[in-house]
């Protein structure tokens, strides 16, 4: 059984419509990542889709992540546990760190090869989730 720590997660009964909206948002971001050849856009929307997938799966379990420092790490940890795949935490955290460098430290340029590998990784997470 997965433990949703109260300092990071709040128990919340989501309506099915809300969970469907989370899923549609995650799928929309994945579609954007798949439809462009701009590496930075592929990466950003792949990462966002992965986080939103985690938010949706956590919501299905009746929890909402608390919005505070480190909450993306907690989403990735739970996503990894829910899908029983340690690589999701490892690669997801690598994506998070690269995103943070890009966002907070003046940026970086991710090559096409790396961005497409991340996209394939995120697509595999969706498959593992049955989506």
Where are these regions (language model features)?
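Terminal alpha-helical segments
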Residues: 1-131
């Amino acid at each position: 059984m997965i433990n949703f720590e109260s300092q990071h997660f709040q128990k919340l009964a989501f309506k099915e419509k809300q969970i469907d909206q989370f899923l549609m948002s995650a799928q929309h971001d994945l579609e954007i990542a798949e439809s462009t050849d701009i590496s930075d856009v592929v990466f950003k929307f792949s990462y966002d889709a992965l986080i939103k997938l985690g938010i949706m799966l956590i919501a299905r379990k009746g929890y909402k992540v608390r919005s505070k420092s480190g909450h993306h790490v907690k989403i990735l940890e739970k996503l990894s546990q829910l899908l029983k795949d340690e690589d999701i935490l490892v690669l997801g955290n690598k994506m998070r760190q690269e995103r943070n460098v890009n966002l907070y430290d003046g940026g970086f340029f991710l090559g096409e090869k790396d961005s497409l590998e991340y996209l394939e990784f995120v697509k595999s997470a969706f498959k593992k989730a049955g989506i």
